[in-house]
Amino acid sequence: MGRHYEIVLLVHPDQSEQVQAMLERYKALIENGHGKIHRLEDWGRRQLAYPIQKLVKAHYLMMNIEVEQSVLNELVDLFRFNDAILRHLAIKRSGPYTEQSFIMKSKDDKGDKPERRRRDDDESGDVGVSNDSDNDGGNAEAA
């Protein structure tokens, strides 16, 4: 059939509402080209490592697909000429990746964890109070 690819897209945060329509267009192109989508993840808005076009956040999407080279070329051209897509990356993979990505796993785990206590909840007003047995007034050298 085709080759396996992993594609990550960074979409302009103002275009988050149009993400589903964009995905439907890309899905149709892949399926019309006799390709398969093995995994599709919407990571949502995330902080960027560095500003892109003066933006500090972007909407992330990740796909694992199996397509012919010609279909991939069409997809990349669509990504390149779509102003809503800030960055795109297509990587050739050795096979289909269908299990959940690390980012989605960590998102799920966050929902399962109990809420962490804040540091200021821990300290019950004892800020600045020292224990005299631990603090000898800085005379450790003289002793």
Swiss-Prot record:
Biased composition (Basic and acidic residues): 105-121
Role this protein plays: Binds together with bS18 to 16S ribosomal RNA.
Keyword annotations: Ribonucleoprotein, Ribosomal protein, RNA-binding, rRNA-binding
UniProt keyword Membrane present: no
GO CC terms in record: cytosolic small ribosomal subunit
Pfam families (alphabetical): Ribosomal_S6 (PF01250)
Biased segments, Low complexity type: 126-143
Top-level taxon in the UniProt lineage: Bacteria
Gene Ontology MF terms in the entry: small ribosomal subunit rRNA binding; structural constituent of ribosome
HAMAP family, sorted: Ribosomal_bS6
Record protein name field: Small ribosomal subunit protein bS6
GO process terms (BP): translation
Residue ranges, annotated region (Disordered): 100-143
Gene: rpsF
